[in-house]
Amino acid sequence: MLAYIKGNLEMKMTDYVVIDVGGLGYKVFMSENGIENLGNIGETVKVHTHYRVREDDISIFGFNT
């Protein structure tokens, strides 16, 4: 279980961001509003997470603190 992810914001798309933590890029799905309020590329960000595991999918959903 992941409680949160803190790292360097590498990419912003319409429905997800990529956060680099120690050289590993986490794809975190977020709302458009959450992405807009997250920060700028290159900044350190912290996102609370929900880690969803299904038979055919593993996803991370992020929420602003």
PLM region spans:
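Long, highly charged, low-complexity intrinsically disordered interaction regions
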Residues: 2, 11-65
